[in-house]
C-alpha cells in the first residue's frame, strides 16, 4: 500500500473512533441524567412522604365533654377532610373531670367543655391558656326511651308533661314536676362534681320550684325524700339503663338526646337553662360542689387550647374551624350556634384568634374567669 493511501485510511479510522466515543459518551450522559433524575424524584417523593408521615404520626388529641362526643367526632372528621390534619378519637368524660386530668399534665391538644369554669384557671390551673370561646348554646331536657313508656307511671308522666308544654300554665307544669318527683319513676343524674349536667338537673328543679310552686326547694326535696334519683359518674353512663328501663328519665342536654336518638321532654324556657331571655332568673339558683358553688346560667359549649397543647398551631386551626363552621354543622343536633362566637380572655390571644375578631367571627366578651 502506498504512503498516501495509508495516511488516508488512518485518518478515516480515527474519525470513526471519535464518532464512537462521542456516541458512547452521549448515551452515558443520557443514562446518568435519566437515572439520576429518577433517583432524585424517588428521593424527593420519599422525603415528602416522610414529611407527611411526621405531620400525621401524632394526631391532635381532643378532650370532649361526654355529652358532646358524637358531635365532637363529627367535627373531627370534617376538620380532617378539610385540612388533612389527623385527630385521635375524642377522649370523653365529664367536663370537670377532664379539666382535672388536663391540669395534672395529661397530653391534650384541644378541650371542648360544657362548663365555663372547666376552661378557666380555677380548674385547669397552670394549663389554662387564659382564653376560651363560647360557640354554641344548649338546654336541659329529660330524656326517656321506648322502655319508659312500658311503665304506667312513667307513661302518665310523659302525657302530663306534654300537656303542660301545650298549655304552658303554672298549674300544668306543677302537675308535670310533681309527677316527676313522686318517686314512682326514677330519674338519672350525672355526678354533679364530675359532670355539669348533674348539677344543672338540680338547678332546673330549683328554678321550676320557684316558678311553679313558689318554693325553690320543693321539687328538689320531694325527689330526694321519695328516693327518685339515681346517680352515676356521668349522664352518658345512664343512657344504657334508660334504654333498658332501669330508670325512666335522664337529665341530659337536648343535643345529646338528639345525637343518641332519644325521646325527651321539652321543658319551658323559664327553667331549661337554654334561653338568654331568662339568664337573670337562672342566676338566682345554685348548687354546692366539692370545689365551690355553681350558679345557674345559660348552657354554653366552650373550646380552648391548653397551655401545653401537643401542637399549638394545628390546635388553633381546629379552634378556628369550629368557630367558622359551627352554624352549619351543629344546628342539626339541636344546638344553637353563637354568632358571633364569644371570646373570653385574660391574656393576649394568638394572632389567628385576633384575625377571627377582625373578621367579625369572634366577639370579645370579657375576662376568662369562673
Region annotations inferred by a language model:
Residues 1-55, 370:
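Secretory targeting signatures
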Residues 16-24, 85, 102, 235:
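Hydrophobic aliphatic residue packing
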Residues 54-83, 91, 95-96, 100-103, ...:
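Exported/periplasmic ABC-transporter solute-binding proteins
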Residues 131, 140, 185-187:
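Generic beta-strand structural signal
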